Amino acid sequence: MRALFLIYLILSPFRAVSRTLLENHEGLNVGSGYGRGTNLPPPSPASSPPSKEVSNSVSPTRTDEKTSENTELVMTTIAQGENSNQLFPFLTSSDNYQLASFKKLSISYLLPVSYVWKLISSSSFNHDLVDIFDTSSDEKYWNRKPLSPPSPKPADGHRPLQSY
């Protein structure tokens, strides 16, 4: 029971990972904005940061400053993602997306499960995990003689009390 609970605890975060991978594969959650898909049109020029071609007499508005900050945030996020891709070059394989997602899930799922399984099998409660095909332990259990009740012995050298 404890082993099943540990496996459930390990698997629960990866349901969201697999759901996200599926959405990204279908193009539902791809984009630089929060939940912005690939099917949406690009942002309008009014919301983009002011270009250098605009005269310097026009001061940028407050929304333009926020947009440029958001753009910088997105660019730093993309740069961080590229750095992680350099660490694990096989995670982003454009020619075979399913293989890349399988490798990513195997690293994030199979390694922790095998580690926890080693802990369970080497721990002190491995007697709970009985081999179902091992009949020798069953024979020892069912063929065991019942314990006989303890024989009445005198306590501390005194005679046992007799019932009248």
From Swiss-Prot:
Expressed in leaves. Its main location: secreted. Residues 32-71, 140-164 are annotated as: Disordered. GO terms for biological process: defense response. It is found in: Secreted. Keywords: Glycoprotein, Hormone, Hydroxylation, Plant defense, Secreted, Signal. Glycans are attached at P42, P43, P45, P49, P50, P149, P150, P152. O-glycosylated; contains pentose side chains. GO terms for molecular function: hormone activity. Residues 1-18 form the signal peptide. Residues 19-35, 54-142, 161-164 form a propeptide. GO terms for cellular component: extracellular region. Induction: By methyl jasmonate in leaves. Residues 155-164 have a biased composition (Basic and acidic residues). The modification 4-hydroxyproline is found at P42, P43, P45, P49, P50, P149, P150, P152. Activates a lipid-based signal transduction pathway in which linolenic acid is converted to jasmonic acid, a potent activator of defense gene transcription, including proteinase inhibitors. This is Hydroxyproline-rich systemin B.
